[in-house]
């Protein structure tokens, strides 16, 4: 923790409040970043006069992803919800986990670990690699043996909660003076 962080910690009059405010800041930044991405997409669609739809064209999905999911049209309604919120929830969970991991190892190693973990999600489809839940092409609606959206929601909630609680407990005993 650098001098600015130490000064803010002293002014907040408590480690728990400081950790929770840092988690809140992390969550707000993640939501804002995703909002900017979504807003950029909408602006691009408006500039190129592309249609912005809140539904999924099942025929196009079958052609693009070589699936045969025309019989599951009722399940497709959850896809737009998942496209918007599940990647945000997974990002929040990963960001909070990286921040918590930085309490135990140096931040650069925490970043490297999370980067390799997320990179592995691009190459291996498994519920263990939680980055798969942030990729709609890996959902069970698109892929025969794909990820369940409900599992992604549960995993993201558990990761967010565990990261906040473990970080809160660990930061109480964290030596802020003798660390890099």
PLM region descriptions:
Residues 35, 39, 96, 129, ...:
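Transmembrane alpha-helix boundary/anchor motif
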Residues 106-122:
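Central hydrophobic cores of alpha-helical transmembrane segments
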Residues 99-107, 172-177:
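Membrane-interface helix-boundary motifs at transmembrane edges
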Residues 160-180:
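Junction motif at the cytosolic side of a transmembrane helix
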Residues 1, 30-34, 108:
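Transmembrane alpha-helices and adjacent helix-loop boundaries
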Residues 1-28:
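Helix-loop-helix units of permease transmembrane domains in multi-pass membrane transporters
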């Amino acid at each position: 923790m650098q001098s600015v962080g130490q000064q803010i910690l002293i002014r907040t009059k408590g480690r728990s409040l400081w950790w929770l405010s840092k988690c809140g800041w992390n969550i707000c930044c993640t939501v804002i970043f995703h909002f900017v991405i979504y807003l950029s997409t909408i602006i691009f669609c408006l500039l190129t006069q592309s249609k912005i739809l809140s539904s999924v064209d099942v025929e196009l999905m079958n052609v693009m992803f070589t699936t045969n999911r025309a019989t599951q049209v009722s399940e497709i309604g959850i896809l737009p919800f998942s496209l918007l919120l599940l990647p945000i929830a997974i990002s929040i969970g990963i960001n909070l986990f990286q921040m918590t991991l930085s309490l135990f190892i140096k931040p650069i190693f925490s970043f490297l670990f999370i980067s390799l973990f997320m990179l592995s999600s691009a190459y291996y489809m498994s519920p263990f690699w939680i980055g798969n839940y942030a990729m709609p092409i890996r959902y069970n609606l698109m892929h025969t043996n794909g990820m369940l959206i409900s599992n992604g929601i549960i995993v993201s909630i558990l990761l967010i909660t565990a990261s906040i609680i473990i970080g809160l407990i660990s930061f109480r005993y964290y030596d802020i003076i003798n660390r890099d």
